[in-house]
Amino acid sequence: MKLGLALPPPQRDLRLDLFRGLANWAMFLGHVPGTVLVWCSFRNYGFSDGADLFVFISGYTSALVYTRKMERGFVFGTSRLFRRVWQIYTAHILLFLIYLAFVHFLSERFNAPDLVNLFNAGPVTSAPVEMMTQGLLLRYKPLNLDVLPLYVVLMGLFPPILWLMLRFPDAVMIGSVLLYLAARQFHWNLPSYPSGSWYFNPLAWQLLFVTGAWLALTGAGRLHFLLRSRFVLVVAIAYLIFGALMTLAAHQPQLRALFGPALFELFNPNDKTNLAPYRYLHLMVLIILGARFIPIDARGLQATIWRPLIKCGQQSLEVFCVGILLAFIGYFILQLAGNGILAQLLVGAAGIAIMTAVAYYRAWSKRVEKSSHESPVDGKRAPESTGSVEHLVLRGGGRVPQVARGTDSRQPPLTEV
């Protein structure tokens, strides 16, 4: 089976950065428990939330980035993927250590022992060596530190998946669906320590990641008719309204009465661990509507108001890690200084401002680093430097995979996380 990959004129899809930044902000706000900030996150208005969007976009962008690297051979592409896996893993371990240090220091310093148990940091006190070892193995995870281990696993398994997807995309997508169904049916999951299993079941959540990759490489072009269908539009909007009402019903008994106990219990509690089908469908509906009403060349994407979100999306690994720490610090400050509405809003605004500042700093730092690789004679970049990878459209004919090397000098290279 021969396939060819054709690229449109070079253009960075700012929608990916925008929504990835939005997912980061939403996850930060949703991780400050017991505050009005959680009502600014997605999870209270539908079945899916920022984590679903984050994993989907990560799969989409990973396919775009590493398809080009696979052009130079499977071994080279795999080595680049594993290098990125190592970067994500080390970021998680650094976050893991700093997070535990913050929790235990503030707990001791301000005589707040409940912090240790609330954020699942207590086991480190009783068995530090064992828990640190299990942390390195990604089996022990304090509260809110579940996303990056999931991403390490998904990226670590991506080389053979991408290689196969470039040749048999539909077969890989079908295999992903079958694995998802089997994991839910037979309760397959990875073990956690000291007990239980992973909060984000990789065997189920891989479906979102693979769906993103499949759409990036072939599915988006073939399913474009969904964006033009008025019937799909009506059904999508109806499902979003249903999802919002059903989710709000978990907090409002008056709404719960509209659905009845049997229907309500089908959707509550929301099965996030095993990626309930209604969560997956909810995100797909959001993606269809987003692609329909926000085209890739929408002029509004260049507006100044969206630049902080886009910048946070472009530097999402660093922003995500900082956001997790800020969520804990924000919660602690509110417990210490008062949990009034104004204080909560100030904590949320300060957290987003710091995350945005980190994103701009990292973007500036990367530009400085890249400029150091410029040739001192003619100002050209070193040969190993790569440009951006834009949206791919799968077509018949040709060989696997020849990807154009066009770049847009106005935008930074597309990154996978």
Q: For the regions a protein language model found, what residue spans apply to each?
A:
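Alpha-helical transmembrane segments and their immediate juxtamembrane cytosolic regions
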Residues: 1-395, 401-406, 410-417
